Amino acid sequence: MPIDLNDGSLESLFTFGGVSGNVVDFPTFHILAIGNWSGDAERRDFSERPAIEIDRDNFDEIIGRLNTSVLLDFDDGSEIVLEFGSLDDFHPDEIFRRVDMFEQLRSLRKRLNSSDTFNAAAYEAKQLFGLKREDIEPASSVADDEPVADNLLDAILLRPEGGAAAPKPKLSSEIGSLVSELVRPHLVTVDEHQQSSLVALVDAATSGLMRKILHHRKFQALEAAWRGLFFLVRRAETSTDLKIFVLDASKDELAADLKSAESLSSTKLYEVLVRDAVETQDLDPWSLILGDYAFAPILDDVATLMRVSKIAAAAGAPFVSHMRPDVLGVHSLYEHSDPTEWKSAGDSDTAKLWSALVGQTESQALGMTIPRFITRLPYGSDTEPLDTFMFEEFESASEHDNYLWSNGCFAVAQMLADSFANYGWEMKDRLTQDIDGLPLHIYKADGETVYKACAEIPMTDVGVNKLLEAGLMPLASYRGTDRIRLAMYQSITGSALRGRW
């Protein structure tokens, strides 16, 4: 039925159907990270997926067990499928070794660097890179283009009917349009003797293709998820009392689960968070739920958060995720870092949706972080050089959207895990709020040394206070350092985040 934003009907849609759970405190601190861990892999129905324990020792095993993969589609219609069996498989060195397109470019480069195969390879390269017809015709004699054979019989067998050996295309048609687009800015008029120019084009194509992969929105999302989780797993002192689990679910799957059932107590999320852990006590109760998603103040997202918060409250564990800057009236914090540009929604539908969410009691179990934080440096000679080829991930000094930004929920989880490891359940008044040792990108811009903020933007006190007033959990960068600070553990209602502590 249609939702009237003025009569509070949004909240009334989400009920447990009469079921309630009483939370019993246990000495364990269990974290559940829900996210799209398997990417584009085929998987069982969400209702059949278990929560899986993960730690430093089995981290790569879990990546493989989930058959983690991603299908990257490009504007020219080409596609690349990447499969991951470990965190290292996200590294450009491994991608370079495993992706067939790079093998074809490696082969072409090797043949261009050999005097025995240069002429045929040059002809092939010019076709691939779309040089003019007159530049494609070999300038040297036919004999120079013939493949070199160990003996006369081999030479004869290698010739096509009619005599001279013709260059054989070795690169697939799939790579053709993609590579020609990548190298177009680097094209120069060449002949067969300009070996270095052709090799440079191959290198430009190789780097361009790698950038397209690393910066593809789907690859970035999957890498940011796993590196954010690894940040948490690597730093948390897991033990019999402190454990981390993952539940594989895309944002759409989570939303569908929550809205498809007649009551929230019939959902998969309720089963995992409440029924198994609280009502039947088959599992220890959860202490913290992470949602590796980005939410905006739109109807579908607010409806999902309302349902999640009710289940989280019943489980006695807060749900922490990320709120997009749209809630502040801007699309990007980086492009609008001045807090005076952040506006409230006024009397708009967005404001009514947000008010409905904030107004429900269970939202005290809902914490939304902003901004994101960095989980790896850009690749390059001055930061993280590759072993396989010379590669600069950024073509300019700094490309904000192409950094790897992970969900702030992982930072919050690490701080809470640290607090529990140090103080146990007596941590309430001694919660960790700082993280250091983050990747710090230092670069030159207009002759000046620049330190990239580890949490997207340099945050001022005014900015922090404005985010707190909006009910968010700000992650603030310490200027010129590898540290960030969580301003406050608060719910979107402005009250303290409701947790077992």
PLM feature spans:
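A glycine- and small-residue-enriched flexible loop/hinge signal that marks low-structured segments
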Residues: 137-194, 214, 234-237, 248-249, ...
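A short, well-structured beta->alpha microelement
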Residues: 244-280
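Short, glycine/acidic-rich hinge or "gate" loops at secondary-structure transitions
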Residues: 119-126, 217-224, 329-330
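Well-ordered, non-membrane alpha-helical segments in soluble/globular domains
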Residues: 223-226, 260-275, 300-311
